[in-house]
Amino acid sequence: MLKLNWGPIKSLNPTFPEIQSAVRDSDKQRFALKPRDPANDASSDPADWLIRANQGHSIKVDSEALLRPIAITTPQAAEEAGADDANGEGGGEGEKVKPVPVPVPVPVPETVVHGTYFAFWPSIVASGGLKRMGRNHVHCSTGLPGDDESVVSGMRKDAELLVYVDVERSIREAGMKWWVSENGVVLTEGVDEGGEEGLVPARFFREVVGRRKDVGVLWRDGEWVADLPEGLKVVVPVGKGGRGGRGRGGRRGGGRGGRGGMEV
């Protein structure tokens, strides 16, 4: 339930239309409003509405209930499967099955990319892949912010390294589960592997490339190609914290297994 008298919100004294506007106009579409009763979607009473984050949760959530699964399928097959579930097909003869809304699976996106930073690359290599850290999921996007108008979230615009992931291979070989949030962010809980929890293993990295031309390709087809260039300026981005490296503005290369900051 959306409660305008909840402590952190009450002090701001917002109106329901202001909250609707904030949710609707958010450039990253981080939140979603849902009517408690779908038949009452025109209500102006906040008590008739639910609000939630589309992704970025640090508390445990039910991915299957909130997110659309990614499956190795075709767009047509995915839509047909969703239609069958929604129509309650599958019951016995004469048996009426109450339709239950089921998230329609989506085919594997052509591009799934995670954005990170020079400061975090050594620790990614050392741990054997991308980690979800304190979140429930590793976040990816289906394109680069600014290059694709459909990409509204999933990666910071100042990301320095692009980690392209072979999602289909990760599903086939590791049974990894992938999801799409309401605002188009691609999410995965990863797998437990090599003593690490919630990992997207580096063997599923299709390519890791710097956004700067002088960085080049670091990883390809699950294999190391090169380290970060020596003397590269490494800056921990604002709001990302982490220890390691040489602090803000330090210089170093990115040798394999080196000590770095936390991955995001």
Each model region followed by its residue ranges:
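Conserved NAD+-utilizing ADP-ribose enzyme module
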Residues: 2-138, 142-264
